[in-house]
């Protein structure tokens, strides 16, 4: 198992790196050049930089990921593709994407896009909380223990 992180706006990178390093599972952070950092990462953590174009990180993750790898993303499109490839996919707010819930999530995203296209506003996501982070930590630890 390897862990791929859609890292541009991921608020749980520290949790992923800490827990995966303890478990000696490789972590690959995929991020755009616009988020370049000289920060040194622990052994077993690699950063791959991609162009800043839309979905560039998603395409790179899908190119690299194999069946049973774990992917952390908030992108429903990437989650859907990764599930079809046989990957385990988690959202940073502490829930697991499944074949049962992804269709509803994609449908909701589509309907919200249509509302915005018509000139109306939609509610954004709720703020990320410390409770969300702990929920993610518990789920993540259970997934890497499998």
From Swiss-Prot:
Listed Pfam families: DUF188
Organism superkingdom: Bacteria
Similarity comment text for this entry: Belongs to the UPF0178 family.
HAMAP family: UPF0178
Protein name as it appears in the record: UPF0178 protein BA_3063/GBAA_3063/BAS2849
Species per Swiss-Prot/TrEMBL record: Bacillus anthracis
Native organism taxonomy: Bacteria, Bacillati, Bacillota, Bacilli, Bacillales
């Amino acid at each position: 198992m390897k862990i791929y992180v859609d890292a541009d706006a991921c608020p749980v990178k520290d949790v992923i790196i800490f827990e995966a390093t303890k478990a000696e599972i490789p972590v690959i952070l995929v991020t755009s050049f616009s988020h370049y950092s000289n920060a040194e990462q622990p052994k077993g953590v690699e950063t791959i930089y991609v162009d800043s174009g839309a979905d560039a990180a998603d395409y790179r993750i899908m190119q690299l990921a194999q069946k049973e790898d774990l992917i952390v993303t908030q992108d429903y499109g990437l989650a859907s593709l990764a599930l079809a490839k046989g990957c385990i996919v988690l959202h940073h707010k502490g829930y697991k994407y499944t074949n049962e819930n992804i269709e509803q999530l994609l449908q909701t995203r589509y309907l919200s896009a249509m509302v915005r296209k018509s000139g109306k506003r939609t509610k954004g996501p709720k703020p990320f909380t410390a409770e969300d982070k702990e929920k993610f930590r518990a789920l993540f630890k259970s997934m890497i223990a499998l």
